[in-house]
From Swiss-Prot:
Chief location category: cytoplasm
Positions occupied by motif MIT-interacting motif: 186-196
Compositional bias segments (type: Polar residues): 170-182
Record's keyword terms, sorted: Coiled coil, Cytoplasm, Endosome, Membrane, Protein transport, Transport
Species classification: Eukaryota, Metazoa, Chordata, Craniata, Vertebrata
Source organism (scientific name): Danio rerio (Zebrafish)
Name this protein carries in UniProt: Charged multivesicular body protein 1b
A single GO BP: protein transport
Gene Ontology CC terms: cytosol; ESCRT III complex; late endosome membrane; multivesicular body
Compartments in which it is found: Cytoplasm, Cytosol; Endosome; Late endosome membrane
Membrane-related topology note: Peripheral membrane protein
């Protein structure tokens, strides 16, 4: 295993560890919410407020861990592409030297700084790999198109039977959402017309 492959393994491991930390925070948030409810039932508002603050803090920490996990995972995917294409530059190799200790620390600020260095390296690597990625139809990018994210979130909300009131930027209306909405609107208009005819 080359040193770059070892670093790649450590990146993937760190992404999983960050995800685990996120789930741990989720559990702690739920436990704090239960404590809030119990404190309110006992009429102890001061204790309820403390547990509510803890719940919010755990929720925010969970989101931060999850966001960083996704970021590390995206960088790992880019390193994988670079390793596969044998395009690991000297400057990129320099960035990874202190990486292992940073990832093991689970310090979000340090990991964020490390990811920024990687992302800068990938900006230059992108120019070199664009042609190769096009031919491979690679979908590995550091950012995900927001329209696709919004559409997926709407689909998941529909499956769960929830109403997801999301403000989509103009010009990015999801075709799935609009066709369903217009069909529902047509049906509602027809029912309203029938009711008017009856009255």
């Amino acid at each position: 295993m080359s040193s770059m492959e070892k670093h790649l393994f450590n990146l993937k491991f760190a992404a999983k560890e960050l995800q685990r930390n996120s789930k741990k925070c989720d559990k702690e948030e739920k436990a704090e919410k239960v404590k809030v409810k119990k404190a309110i039932q006992k009429g102890n508002m001061e204790v309820a407020r403390i547990h509510a603050e803890n719940a919010i803090r755990q929720k925010n920490q969970s989101v931060n861990f999850l966001r960083m996990s996704a970021r590390v995972d995206a960088v790992a995917a880019r390193v994988q592409t670079a390793v596969t294409m044998n395009q690991v530059t000297k400057s990129m190799a320099g960035v990874v030297k202190g990486m292992d200790a940073t990832l093991k620390s689970m310090n979000l600020e340090k990991i964020s700084g490390l990811m920024e260095k990687f992302e800068r390296q990938f900006e230059t690597l992108d120019v070199q790999t664009a042609q190769m990625e096009d031919s491979m139809s690679s979908t590995t990018t550091l950012t995900t198109p927001q329209g696709q994210v919004d559409t997926l979130m709407m689909e998941m909300a529909d499956e769960a039977g929830l109403d997801l009131n999301m403000e989509l930027p103009q010009g990015q209306t999801g075709s799935v959402g609009t066709s369903v909405a217009s069909a529902e609107q047509d049906e509602l208009s027809q029912r309203l017309a029938k009711l008017r005819d009856q009255v």
